A protein has these predicted regions:
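Short, solvent-exposed turn/loop segments enriched in Gly/Ser/Thr/Pro and often Arg
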Residues: 1-7, 34-38, 108-118, 165-172, ...
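Catalytic-site neighborhoods of secreted/periplasmic enzymes
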Residues: 1-74, 173
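Loop/turn elements at helix/coil->beta-strand transitions in domains of secreted/extracellular proteins
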Residues: 26-29, 101-108, 156-163, 204-205, ...
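Substrate-binding rim/cap in mid-to-C-terminal beta-strand-loop elements of soluble/periplasmic
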Residues: 39, 146-155, 181-246, 250-261, ...
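Active-site His/acidic residue clusters
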Residues: 41-42, 46-52, 58, 92-137, ...
Length: 377
C-alpha cells in the first residue's frame, strides 16, 4: 500500500481497493497470507488481491518483551495474531486437498509466520517443551509438517511430491536465547552469532529435501543457498533463463537428482547492516571488523578494537573463534577472494554471463576501499 516513508498514514489507505503487484500479479494463481511478518501492520489477511476484512481497530504496540514484539497498527475485524499461523496452515491443507483429483502438477509456497515474533504457540502446544514458548512454537512447526505429509499421504500424492523445508535466517538472539541456553538448548548449535549477524549462526539454516524413493537418511555438504532454487526450478522445468534472470543463482538440480554437484564455488553473505562477506568451501572473508548485526561487536567504538577485516577457516574453526586475517599462509586466497567480490559488484552478478546493472543504490564502499588498498587504485 506504500503508506510508509512518504508522509501518508495508514488512515489514508482505502483498504477496499485491490492490491497491485501482489503474488497473483507475480505468477501465483491463488494467495492467502499477510502483508509482512506478524509483528508489522497492517494486521489483515490478504486473499488474492483483496483484504478479507477492512481494518476497524488498532492493535497497540508491544515492545517491552521482544519475544511478543508487535509494532502496532490497524487491524481487520477477523484478525487475531494468535490465530494467524493456524489459519495459514488450514488454507494450505485445503489447497493440497483441492489438488487431490487433479492430473496437473501443483506448487505450494508456504512462508509461515512462525517462529518469527511474536512468539504465539497455540494453546495445545503451550508447555510442550522444557525451554519455553519459543520451543513450543517450533514444535508447532513440526506438527505443521506432520499435517502436510499426512494429507499428501492420504491423497496418495506423497510419492510424487518434492517437499523442501528451510528457513530464511538463523535464530534471533533477542527471543530468550540466554534462558534457553541455561536449559541446555543452543539454537545456533556450535556456531557464532544469530539472525542479522555476518557469522555462521546468522546464515546457516536447515535445508531438508524429501523426495520419496530418491533419498534415504543422507547429508550433502555442498555449498548452496536458497537463491539457488531459482535456477534449480528453471532447470527442472526446462526454462531458459534470460540474461538478467537469476544473476546470483546456481542450479543444484544435479545434487537433488543425484547426478552430480553444483557449479557454485563461493557465496556472498550480507549482514543486517549491509556488510558483506564471501565464503568458499573452506574460507570466509568478512569485509568488516564487526558482526554487522546485533551481536558483539556492534558499536563503532567496539568494532574499532578489531582488525578491519575478518578471515575464518570454517572447516577447522566452524565456531569462528579465531580471526586469521593476518596469517600469511592465506595471503593468496584472500587476494583472490577480494578480486572475486570486486568482480561480482562490478558485473552485477556472481554467475557467468553478461554484465548487468545492480538494482540497488548501495555502493558497497567497504569492498571498494579494500580493493583500492590491495591494488593501489
Amino acid at each position: 500500500w506504500g503508506y510508509t516513508g512518504n508522509g501518508r498514514s495508514m488512515k489514508d489507505i482505502d483498504f477496499s481497493l485491490p492490491i497491485k503487484n501482489g503474488p497473483t500479479d507475480r505468477g501465483f494463481n491463488y494467495y492467502f497470507g499477510i502483508p509482512a511478518s506478524l509483528d508489522i501492520s497492517p494486521y489483515v489477511y490478504v486473499e488474492n488481491d483483496e483484504v478479507t476484512s477492512i481494518p476497524d481497530h488498532v492493535i497497540e504496540p508491544q515492545k517491552k518483551n521482544l519475544a511478543l514484539l508487535m509494532h502496532g497498527g490497524m487491524a481487520g475485524a477477523d484478525f487475531k495474531p494468535e490465530e494467524c499461523f493456524p489459519n495459514i496452515i488450514r488454507h494450505s491443507l485445503n489447497y493440497i486437498n483441492e489438488q487431490k483429483d487433479s492430473k496437473k502438477p501443483f506448487f505450494l509456497y508456504l512462508p509461515i509466520t512462525a517462529p518469527h515474533t511474536p512468539i504465539l504457540p497455540s494453546k495445545e502446544f503451550q508447555g510442550k517443551t522444557s525451554i519455553g514458548p519459543y520451543g513450543d512454537f517450533v514444535v508447532m512447526i513440526d506438527d505443521m509438517v506432520r499435517q502436510i505429509v499426512k494429507t499428501l499421504k492420504k491423497n496418495k500424492q506423497l510419492d510424487n511430491t518434492i517437499i523442501v523445508f528451510a528457513s530464511d535466517n538463523g535464530c534471533a538472539g533477542y527471543i530468550g536465547v540466554k534462558d534457553m541456553e541455561k536449559k541446555g538448548h543452543f539454537p545456533s548449535y556450535i556456531y557464532r552469532g544469530y539472525k542479522s549477524d555476518i557469522y555462521e549462526g546468522g546464515h546457516r539454516i536447515p535445508l531438508i529435501v524429501s523426495w520419496k524413493g530418491k533419498y534415504g537418511k543422507e547429508t550433502n555438504n555442498s555449498l548452496v543457498s536458497l537463491i539457488d532454487f531459482y535456477a534449480t526450478f528453471a532447470q527442472m522445468l526446462n526454462h531458459n533463463l534470460e540474461t538478467e534472470e537469476a544473476v546470483d543463482s546456481y542450479s543444484m538440480w544435479s545434487i537433488l537428482s543425484k547426478k552430480g554437484t553444483s557449479a557454485r564455488k563461493d557465496l556472498v553473505h550480507e549482514a543486517g547492516e549491509g556488510y558483506l562477506s564471501l565464503r568458499t568451501s573452506q574460507l570466509k572473508l568478512v569485509f568488516y571488523g564487526g558482526s554487522g548485526g546485533f551481536s558483539y561487536p556492534v558499536k563503532p567504538s567496539d568494532v574499532a578494537k578489531f582488525p578491519p577485516m575478518q578471515l575464518f577457516d570454517i572447516v577447522k574453526d566452524p565456531s569462528e573463534k579465531e580471526n586469521i586475517i593476518g596469517d600469511k599462509r592465506y595471503e593468496n586466497e584472500v587476494k583472490e577472494m577480494k578480486r572475486a567480490m570486486k568482480q561480482y559488484v562490478e558485473n552485477g552478478r556472481s554467475t557467468p554471463g553478461e554484465k548487468v546493472s545492480n538494482d540497488t543504490k548501495n555502493s558497497w564502499n567497504q569492498v571498494k576501499i579494500f580493493m583500492q588498498e590491495e591494488e593501489g587504485i
